[in-house]
């Protein structure tokens, strides 16, 4: 018991940095996680598994979705609810798709301590939602959503996610200066400020409602060329009588009326004439009202602050199951998170790449052997076949 407490203490304050949460799924136990029973008939089941072709059957264990076309909800309580006030917060995890995903979320959520994990679902309030989301060709992105004053705010930038079948590492760093970074596979893919890249605050500047466009403002960029004249021979009818048409032999003017030639398209017809367009010498550009300070804007130096973080959870809809979540870490040290990412993710990813390359090489060699065999003369092929003769006993 003492050794367990010591391990927990060391993990929380490892080497001078704080670890608020860590989960590496060292065995197949799922007892620390609570699966949601909300809308139970549509809920899929999470299991701790290593997937179809793990690099290491123990190291690769993770929280896996197991049923197609299901909602998923699961959460684990953080031993001590925390706030990131005055500190950097790093949220990191790995995800591997065990099969090709046509549509499915693979993002993590941080939840308040007042959540009921058994009733956890898509409308449950959360602090942060972070991670990949794939649906068809249109959606392949990393979500970064903050809840600010009760409203969820999506990042205004597009961050592409990985959609292959290898393990990938996703990292979000939120700093106390309201700056953030997003890393994929320990490489920075986006950074900026919470104020600029989310609409959590009203804009600093707005249009002056009292500013009016001057009466003589010209905002028409192009005008008709006054010197361009319509050619004299332009006006030709759209259709003309077909001179090759013949009056039917059985046409009776008394009964059928006077026969008229049918119309056909006129090859000389040029359509409606319009003068060419030229730059307007009086054009002043697009008029915009003067910008003034927004009286509704108020700087908030604590946009980054998330209080009472009490649960880690996954709330997903997946058409294609098989997502494996692992190596979940919440810490105040980007350096420690990077080290852990390299230690836990890198060797697995490199092994998966090597395995993929080896498989591709084997497939190529097999295809070449098959091709060579097909190109052999018939006699050569026959000589390779086992003989049908048998020695007599």
From Swiss-Prot:
InterPro entries given in the database record: Calret/calnex, Calret/calnex_CS, Calreticulin, Calreticulin/calnexin_P_dom_sf, ConA-like_dom_sf
Chain positions covered by the region annotation 4 X 12 AA approximate repeats: 189-253
Cleavable signal peptide: 1-16
Glycosylation sites: 27
Residue positions of motif Prevents secretion from ER: 390-393
UniProt-annotated stretches for the region Disordered: 194-277, 351-393
Family note: Belongs to the calreticulin family.
Taxonomic path: Eukaryota, Metazoa, Spiralia, Lophotrochozoa, Platyhelminthes
Cystine connections: 103-135
Biased composition (Basic and acidic residues): 202-216, 227-249, 258-277
Naturally occurring in which organism (per UniProt): Schistosoma mansoni
Function, in words: Molecular calcium-binding chaperone promoting folding, oligomeric assembly and quality control in the ER via the calreticulin/calnexin cycle. This lectin may interact transiently with almost all of the monoglucosylated glycoproteins that are synthesized in the ER.
Name this protein carries in UniProt: Calreticulin
Swiss-Prot/TrEMBL keywords: Calcium, Chaperone, Disulfide bond, Endoplasmic reticulum, Glycoprotein, Lectin, Metal-binding, Repeat, Signal, Zinc
Main location: endoplasmic reticulum
């Amino acid at each position: 018991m003492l050794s367990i407490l010591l391990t927990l203490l060391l993990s929380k304050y490892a080497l001078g940095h704080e670890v608020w949460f860590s989960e590496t799924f060292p065995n197949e136990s799922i007892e620390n996680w609570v699966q949601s029973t909300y809308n139970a008939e549509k809920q899929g089941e999470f299991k701790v598994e290593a997937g179809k072709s793990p690099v290491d059957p123990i190291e690769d264990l993770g929280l896996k979705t197991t049923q197609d076309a299901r909602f998923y909800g699961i959460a684990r309580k953080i031993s001590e609810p925390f706030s990131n006030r005055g500190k950097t917060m790093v949220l990191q995890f790995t995800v591997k798709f065990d099969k090709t995903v046509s549509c499915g979320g693979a993002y993590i959520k941080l939840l308040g301590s007042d959540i009921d994990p058994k009733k956890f679902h898509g409308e449950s309030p959360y602090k942060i939602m972070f991670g990949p989301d794939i649906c068809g060709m249109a959606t392949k992105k990393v979500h970064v959503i903050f809840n600010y004053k009760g409203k969820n705010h999506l990042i205004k930038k597009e961050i592409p996610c990985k959609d292959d079948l290898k393990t990938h590492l996703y990292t979000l760093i939120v700093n106390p200066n309201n700056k953030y970074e997003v890393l994929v596979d320990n490489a920075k893919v986006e950074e900026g400020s919470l104020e600029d890249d989310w609409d959590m605050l009203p804009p600093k500047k707005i249009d002056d409602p009292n500013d009016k466009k001057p009466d003589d403002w010209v905002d028409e960029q192009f005008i008709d060329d006054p010197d361009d004249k319509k050619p004299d021979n332009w006006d030709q009818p759209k259709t003309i009588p077909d001179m090759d048409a013949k009056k039917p032999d059985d046409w009776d003017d008394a009964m059928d009326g006077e026969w008229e030639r049918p119309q056909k398209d006129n090859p000389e017809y040029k359509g409606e004439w319009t003068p060419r367009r030229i730059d307007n010498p009086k054009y002043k550009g697009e008029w915009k009202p003067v910008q003034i300070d927004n009286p509704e804007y108020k700087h908030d130096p604590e946009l980054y602050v998330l209080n009472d973080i009490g649960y880690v959870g996954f709330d997903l809809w997946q058409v294609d199951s098989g997502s494996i979540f692992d190596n979940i870490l919440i810490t105040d040290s980007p350096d420690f998170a990077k080290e852990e990412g390299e230690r836990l993710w890198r060797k697995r990813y490199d092994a998966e790449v090597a395995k993929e390359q080896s498989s591709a090489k084997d497939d190529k060699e097999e295809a070449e052997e098959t091709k060579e065999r097909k190109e052999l003369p018939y006699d050569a092929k026959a000589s390779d076949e086992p003989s049908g003769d048998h020695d007599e006993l």
